[in-house]
Amino acid sequence: MPTITIISYFGFLLASIIFTLVLFISLSKIQLI
């Protein structure tokens, strides 16, 4: 099942990117205040 592995990999990568963006935005808001 290579397809499931690829989907899981991209899903994990997307989650990591979203988590990084949320963390970066949170830090930016804290600095603005």
Swiss-Prot record:
Primary location class: plastid
Transmembrane parts of this sequence: 4-24
Subcellular location: Plastid, Chloroplast thylakoid membrane
Keywords: Chloroplast, Electron transport, Membrane, Photosynthesis, Plastid, Thylakoid, Transmembrane, Transmembrane helix, Transport
GO biological process: photosynthesis
Gene Ontology cellular component list: chloroplast thylakoid membrane; cytochrome b6f complex
Topology term for the membrane: Single-pass membrane protein
A GO term, aspect molecular function: electron transporter, transferring electrons within cytochrome b6/f complex of photosystem II activity
Pfam families cross-referenced by the UniProt entry: PetL
Superkingdom per UniProt: Eukaryota
Known role: Component of the cytochrome b6-f complex, which mediates electron transfer between photosystem II (PSII) and photosystem I (PSI), cyclic electron flow around PSI, and state transitions. PetL is important for photoautotrophic growth as well as for electron transfer efficiency and stability of the cytochrome b6-f complex.
Assigned protein family: Belongs to the PetL family.
Subunit (UniProt): The 4 large subunits of the cytochrome b6-f complex are cytochrome b6, subunit IV (17 kDa polypeptide, PetD), cytochrome f and the Rieske protein, while the 4 small subunits are PetG, PetL, PetM and PetN. The complex functions as a dimer.
Listed name of the protein: Cytochrome b6-f complex subunit 6
Source species taxonomy: Eukaryota, Viridiplantae, Streptophyta, Embryophyta, Tracheophyta
